[in-house]
Amino acid sequence: MEHTYQYAWVIPLLPLPVIMSMGFGLFFIPTATKNLRRIWAFPSVLLLSIAMVFSVQLSIQQINGSSIYQYLWSWTVNNDFSLEFGYLIDPLTSIMLILITTVGILVLIYSDGYMSHDEGYLRFFVYISFFNTSMLGLVTSSNLIQIYFFWELVGMCSYLLIGFWFTRPLAASACQKAFVTNRVGDFGLLLGILGFFWITGSLEFRDLFKIANNWIPNNGINSLLTTLCAFLLFLGAVAKSAQFPLHVWLPDAMEGPTPISALIHAATMVAAGIFLLARLLPLFISLPLIMSLISLVGTITLFLGATLALAQRDIKRSLAYSTMSQLGYMMLALGIGSYQAALFHLITHAYSKALLFLGSGSIIHSMEPLVGYSPDKSQNMVLMGGLRKYIPITRSTFLWGTLSLCGIPPLACFWSKDEILSNSWLYSPFFGIIASFTAGLTAFYMFRIYLLTFDGYLRVHFQNYSSTKEGPLYSISLWGKRIPKGVNGDFVLSTTKSGVSFFSQNIPKMQGNTTNRIGCFSTSFGAKKTFAYPHETGNTMLFPLLILLLFTFFIGFIGISFDNGATDNGIAGLTILSKWLTPSINFTQESSNSSINSYEFITNAISSVSLAIFGLFIAYIFYGSAYSFFQNLDLQNSFYKESPKKAFFGKVKKKIYSWSYNRGYIDIFYTRVFTLGIRGLTELTEFFDKGVIDGITNGVGLVSFCIGEEIKYVGGGRISSYLFFFLCYVSIFLFFFLF
């Protein structure tokens, strides 16, 4: 066993050979390398698979041995200072290693099909392989300086991949936005690391945790300075994990290719912030103010993300806000000290969200032959609908992923989210109310995504792309083009003669049933494809979806916990995850009341599932194919018979839509305050520099020139006169200087 741990340092380095080989080939033999570009996917997957096998072996040893291993190399700079670097293998590391490698492998396989047509295929695989290497290095780091080094590499790779299609202005802008926003957090992280080094004289986790255990009883360190440094560390996690108020970069990051969106949201970029807080939780626990701040930021983020996802039309952007909300749940769990629940939700959410993002990529691929390759159209859920007939495999996997994120048992996210809800109610009713209400919102907006995409009719056939006067009832005016007079463009989902609000899916019946227009085709593996209607993607893209579906079904069972009386340090012995995390849980002092009995579990489960089902029902009322039936029965009017109530309900819907679609006006606020404010300050500085500073300099020169021109005639051109005036000036100067 010791022999296995000694070579764990190989795991982050395994993807590097294929990266270097591709770079060598592109530099020296570019033509041959590009012609044979598809073969590079195999070594990328193979090397990461070896890393996965190694990670699984380490995890099994962690479960059996429950030990923490750390290996260090020391580099002595001088007698007073030495730099230590190495790797740390503990339960948290082993969890993250398995998560990164499994999701990374499936994303690589998926990318081979998704990016096969792209000219930047090799560049994409270089970036994504280096992304995996950086994240693996981050989670195995043994000190803060190593974490910061790999932290920056993870950020760099994410910027490269977000702006992968850099010729598109929106992608370039999104890359810049992610960079600038994360600079704020990264600068705070660096200051926090330097502050703790100044306080403790060490960057090693073991030293920081030992000192942290003595802070409260001994009170030997300035608590204000310590709290400030801890806040700066937390600021880095806020930016990286897209927490309020530094969350604005995450939705725009969807401008990158869909596979990288799956990797960022599941196992790398946004997971890095949660990992950092989990790693440093023993440090934060000794600072109650920071713990309260973490839980408060998490609560705000989970609710804000859910509300902003309610009205998004872009399928990837909707999933991005969903990620933001779920990361808020993890942050809340860490803030209330529920270490196991936070990591459990990190695991279950990663596989479910990877399934949803890769499923959305399959949907986008199926829509592109119909609407073109513009993301405004291929990712627009308003143009979709009825896709369950054409891409049934993708539809099934997407449905299960949606139900998992909604918290429907026995799928993965049900177990972890239910644990967070239970712990939040025990910690504070305020947090419990917000978390539970947001769980209902999660079910609503996730099922909304599913219904708009797969339910009803394929609405793209009702759209007018020809820019001619003839066209069906629907037009693309909802995207700000050709908006008819008298129609509120901010609130209309689709412009029809009957007028359809955002909260509806009323599709008028066209002449001739749309099902009669469907050509003969099959969506099974190896099927003949037609471009008249959406078609299922290839096996390379479907295989990862099916594997992730298995994870979504079964990964949640590792955290099922019941208190049967046989516990070890308050941790239920029958729980695989608890046994896995026992050293970390004991170290972070998680209370034993996290274990619950069967009755409490069933009670909590009924409550959370009821909220989820209610959210699903409301979403189906607004967006399901049965909406037309309810509208014909005047069901909604029966609830609001009085016109003032109907008008009030309409105003509320419009306000909610406007808030959600405009991202809570936060981006607008940042643009006006920071972007325009900094631009105005720059213009003011430029005016001061040119008008005042340059004016004084040029004015002094001009005045000197004019005075010189005037007094040069006083001497009459005689040298004796010049000497006389010179001596007079010197005498006057000496007189004032000396007396």
Curated annotation (Swiss-Prot):
Membrane topology: Multi-pass membrane protein
GO MF annotation list: NADH dehydrogenase (ubiquinone) activity; quinone binding
Localization per Swiss-Prot or TrEMBL: Plastid, Chloroplast thylakoid membrane
GO CC terms of this entry: chloroplast thylakoid membrane
GO biological process: ATP synthesis coupled electron transport; electron transport coupled proton transport
Family: Belongs to the complex I subunit 5 family.
Residues spanning the membrane: 9-29, 39-59, 89-109, 125-145, 147-167, 185-205, 219-239, 258-278, 280-300, 327-347, 354-374, 396-416, 425-445, 542-562, 610-630, 719-739
Record note on quaternary structure: NDH is composed of at least 16 different subunits, 5 of which are encoded in the nucleus.
Known catalytic reactions: a plastoquinone + NADH + (n+1) H(+)(in) = a plastoquinol + NAD(+) + n H(+)(out); a plastoquinone + NADPH + (n+1) H(+)(in) = a plastoquinol + NADP(+) + n H(+)(out)
PANTHER family reported in the protein's UniProt record: NADH-UBIQUINONE OXIDOREDUCTASE CHAIN 5
Pfam families in the record: Proton_antipo_C, Proton_antipo_M, Proton_antipo_N
Protein's name in the database: NAD(P)H-quinone oxidoreductase subunit 5, chloroplastic
The organism's place on the tree of life at top rank: Eukaryota
Keyword set includes Transmembrane helix: yes
Functional description taken from the UniProt entry: NDH shuttles electrons from NAD(P)H:plastoquinone, via FMN and iron-sulfur (Fe-S) centers, to quinones in the photosynthetic chain and possibly in a chloroplast respiratory chain. The immediate electron acceptor for the enzyme in this species is believed to be plastoquinone. Couples the redox reaction to proton translocation, and thus conserves the redox energy in a proton gradient.
EC number: 7.1.1.-
UniProt KW keywords: Chloroplast, Membrane, NAD, NADP, Plastid, Plastoquinone, Quinone, Thylakoid, Translocase, Transmembrane, Transmembrane helix, Transport
